[in-house]
Amino acid sequence: MALGPGRFSVEPTRERPDSPPRSYGVPRRGGTFIEWAHVIERLTTSEGYWIGTVTPGGRPHVVPIWGCFVGDDLYLETGAPDTIKNRNLARNPNVWIHLDDVNDAVMVRGRGVELRSLDRELGEALASAMSGKYKGYDPTPDSWDNGGMWRIEPETVLAWKAMPTSTRWRFDKPG
């Protein structure tokens, strides 16, 4: 898989979420939106990510993990193939990703695509990004040849700083 324009490279359709009650004061049209560039900056600079997966019994499993942005795509490192999160993703690739800050919230709903035997260019880019972001961590380009690295294909992104800035972006289905 070579580097190229990723799923996050083009701003998806922006709209208001359906869920806030009218009493929250979120306008149905117009008003203040979060800018897509802000979402990309938050996803790129975040120290860590929380990933929510689904167990075989349908229960949520949420854990913090490391990740990075490379070539307009979000990549998340999930550790050894036998971890709960990896087993969950292998069975059901649906995920929710969110960042720590409740006052500057960014959440991504999508699907994980496991990467194995990465081409040299992507392996080098991921190893460089991860070692640059996480001090003391020094992966090699082939560190994920047996699994443990997932590219996130976003379907919906939600973000808000405060009411009434709730913003939702919807991506076109790939293919």
Region locations from a protein language model:
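Generic structural signal for secondary-structure transition and capping sites
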Residues: E47-G48, N94, K135, V157
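A generic local structural motif
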Residues: E35-H38, V62-V63, D82, Y137-D138
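Amphipathic alpha-helical interface surfaces
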Residues: V39, K85, L122-L126
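Short, basic/aromatic recognition patches
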Residues: R22-W50
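Charged, gly/pro-rich active-site loop segments
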Residues: A2-F33, N103-G175
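Tryptophan-centered motif/residue detector
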Residues: W36, W50, W66-F69, W160, ...
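Short beta-strand segments
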Residues: S46-P81, R87, V95-L99, M107-R111
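Phosphate-coordinating loops and pocket residues in cytosolic domains that bind phosphorylated ligands
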Residues: R91
